[in-house]
Amino acid sequence: RVLKARLSDSHFIWKTDTSITIKNLNKKLKNVLFYQGLGSLYEKTIRLSKVSKCFSSLFNVDETLAKEASLLSKFDLVSEMVAEFPELQGIMGSYFTKLDGKSKEVSIAISEHYKPKGISDEMPTTNLGAMLSMIDNIDTLTGFFIINKKPTGSKDPFALRRAGFSIVQILMKFKLNISISDLFTESFNSYKNS
């Protein structure tokens, strides 16, 4: 009985979410704060799209797909499904973009960009997913360092160490030869220009 009610709720939420266009969900990100002093989640996606131009060739991905994946990477966070089931972030974005006719590459990248979640977690399998994951983590690290919210020996409330480990894991797995300072310079410039 409980399972049936839960499934019925999920079906209703799915119908509600899929009745709203991705474009309108994405606009809602303008009203969702990433963090005080770091702008909205919408602004974060704009920064990601700017930085993606610099790194798409490094990852050997199409610049247009990189920009699209960056701009759509967070819209599912304002969906009812992710509000109800937060562990589905990225996964729902992938489903919604497939349903909307977006490319398979973009859908997979949206799902993969939260990987890896830890040192022993699954890695992105696609170049586009890896690039999006890396620039998202770089944006987060850069932003929190700009506002002086650095991790300490005993505290890391924003999981910045995990973000740093994720960047290193991606660089190693995809055998990317790039200066870490170049990565952060591009990200810093995207904050400066937003």
Where are these regions (language model features)?
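Amphipathic alpha-helical "coupling" segments that flank catalytic cores
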Residues: 1-194
